[in-house]
Amino acid sequence: EKEYGSAEVMKKDDLMYAAFYSRSAAYSKNPKTPGGFFFDLETMKPLINNPGFVEALTDWVEATKYVPPGGINFGLGDEIGSFGGGQTLFSFSWDDAFVAAMQPDSPINNKVGAAQLPGAMKVWNRKTNSWDEGFNQAPFFVWGWAVGVAKKSKEKEMAFDYLCFFANEANHQ
């Protein structure tokens, strides 16, 4: 079977927005312009129509050349199966694809690794309305599936206990 470059969630209304935001963060989340990613926090003006998001969309369209047949209609399950089944070299997704690739019946079992999302060689600066050149990596956790305790927290143990309580499945019955 022919192999392809990338498996991504591209199907409309099936987490496509999440994949797009993950791709666009490196181009549009500038460390020199703190504050909102989706909206300007002072004006609440949407930021999605800035050149950083447009550049990400341009990249995404380019990536469609390297997906398997039908890949532009991949939902999350399709993306996981494509990568885990050894059809694609790269999965731009959550860890589910990695887990699928590590299954005993996967042709790529024990032949894969995981890394942060790629960065970009420029990032849009909405304060100067220009590109800042240089590498920018701004991983974006869709759905907020990450928690942590601030290094400077005065109540680290209490904060950690709080997180453990809400992460316990028994507390969600």
Locate each region found by the language model.
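Extracytoplasmic/periplasmic solute-binding protein
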Residues: E1-K45, T88
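Short secondary-structure boundary segments
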Residues: M10, D95-D96
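Extracytoplasmic/periplasmic substrate-recognition and gating elements
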Residues: K65, P104-Q173
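Short helix-initiation/N-cap motifs at beta->coil->alpha
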Residues: G71-G85
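Paired acidic/hydrophobic, glycine-rich loop segments that form the ligand-binding mouth/hinge
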Residues: L89-W94, G113-A114
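Glycine-centered hinge/linker elements that transmit conformational signals in sensory
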Residues: A19, K32-N73, Q116-K122
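Pocket-flanking alpha-helical
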Residues: E1-K2, D78-G81, A97-D105
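Stable alpha-helical elements in mature extracytoplasmic
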Residues: M16, F20-R23, F53-W60, E79, ...
